Amino acid sequence: PVWSVVTVDQSKPYTITGAPRVIKGKVIIGNGGAELGVRGYVSAYDANDGKQLWRFFTVPGDPSKGPDGAASDPAMEKARGTWFGDNFYKMGGGGTVWDAIVYDQELDQLYIGVGNGSPWNHKMRSEGKGDNLFLSSVVALNPNPGKYLWHYQGTPGETWDFTQTQPIMLATLKID
């Protein structure tokens, strides 16, 4: 089947720099552009017809607008308490998933690596307070229906572009 779908809001300066991943009948794709003031997310589309199955935002949006109606809504309730002020949602928040997406078949978990904040300066973005979940985190999702499972944040309050967007490798190692 051949289909085409626009995966980003074209009124904002999103970019797409990573390849999609295909798992379990789904095409998974993130986006880039945190440095340009966008809000990050990863989306799953039906591999047969391109219909969006779910979306997981990586940073909270404007609280006055309420939940997004996305798979990430429960996780965003948790994340919202780690952000302060209102600059982050006015300036995008960042947290794009522009490359690091990998699927663990054994655990049936999708791992996404989340990028930098927007604006980059923690003091401007969140009054210099809070961990700013899920910036610079590896987030594990259930690939059906995109439900949050767990996360590890490598750089709380990320300001230095120490992101988790490098390729994620899964390996079984014997360590003595």
Residue ranges: model-predicted function:
Residues 80-86, 119-124, 151:
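Short Pro/Gly-enriched beta-strand edge/turn motifs at strand-loop
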Residues 40-52, 127-146:
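Beta-propeller blade signature
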Residues 1-43, 47-48, 52-88, 97-98:
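Asp-box/WD-like beta-propeller blade repeats and closely related beta-sheet repeat scaffolds
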Residues 15-35, 39, 90-125, 137, ...:
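Repeat-blade elements of multi-bladed beta-propeller folds
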Residues 9-11, 91-93, 153, 159:
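Surface loop/turn motifs at the tips and blade-to-blade linkers of beta-strand repeat domains
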Residues 146-152:
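Gly/Pro-rich turn-and-neighbor structural signature
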Residues 33, 127, 154-157:
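Conserved short loop/turn motifs at secondary-structure junctions
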Residues 56, 60, 114-117, 142:
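Short, small-residue-rich loop/turn micro-motifs
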